[in-house]
């Protein structure tokens, strides 16, 4: 937040809110695991925070397109539909069609915008690569969590979660490099 205000940067401020939202969901989930030894039984508390973070990451991508219209691309549309379909099939945020549908719509839109940028610029920006990788890791984390029941020892779940966190951290340097292009 301090960096966002020092630079008067909308993109840094949006990223800070995205980080804060993701951190709140993760903190709730981890405290529940540490204190009680199992995943939360009150569903969608952490998921709502994580969902808010993806809305902020979507806002960053929309900020990139501010004043421009993404070109229509059948490839980008297909990528968005496939990612949304995978999220719905795997039910990343649990059995609720509402939460899984909201995440599927958000991930599909993010994928569409990222691949539209690929069509426009003939390359993906580093932030978009990290964002697509982060979405893949979020899906993988849910799939892995279906097979892990013992959270007391280091497992594949924690390896994927650490990689997901490091990918989130990588957003900041990518955004700072694009700062001259930030429309503020």
Language model regions located:
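Hydrophobic alpha-helical transmembrane segments of multi-pass membrane proteins
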Residues: 1, 11-35, 47-54, 82-83, ...
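Internal transmembrane alpha-helix with an interfacial aromatic "cap," most often the third helix
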Residues: 1-8, 30-77, 114-115, 171-179
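Juxtamembrane loop-transmembrane helix junctions in multi-pass integral membrane proteins
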Residues: 3-13, 37-44, 94-97, 122, ...
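Membrane-interfacial loop-to-transmembrane alpha-helix junctions, especially the N-terminal start
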Residues: 5-21, 66-78, 120-133, 180-184
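Generic intrinsically disordered, low-complexity segments enriched for polar/acidic and small residues
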Residues: 16-19, 26, 51, 104, ...
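Hydrophobic, aromatic-enriched alpha-helical segments typical of multi-pass transmembrane helices
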Residues: 17, 48-59, 77, 93-108
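Extracellular-loop-to-transmembrane junctions of the mid-late helices
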Residues: 81-119, 153-160
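C-terminal transmembrane-bundle signature of multipass membrane proteins
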Residues: 110-184
